[in-house]
Amino acid sequence: MQLVVNGSSMNIDSDELSITEFIKTLPIGDQPVLVELNGEAVLTREFDERTVRDGDKLEVIRMVAGG
């Protein structure tokens, strides 16, 4: 499937993934993230239920603590 992730095109060898499964394809390890799917913020507790499909647009933001 073809996605737009943080403004860049990305191909995934799957027809549909949960957001949790999609995040595991990214090189970010176990860092906590915020996700926007097609302009809508997705709650972390919904990551297993919400799906990513061909043509979707995602923004994935890593949360970093600092002082």
Residue ranges and their predicted role:
Residues 1-66:
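Ubiquitin-like/PB1-type beta-grasp interaction modules and other compact soluble beta-rich domains
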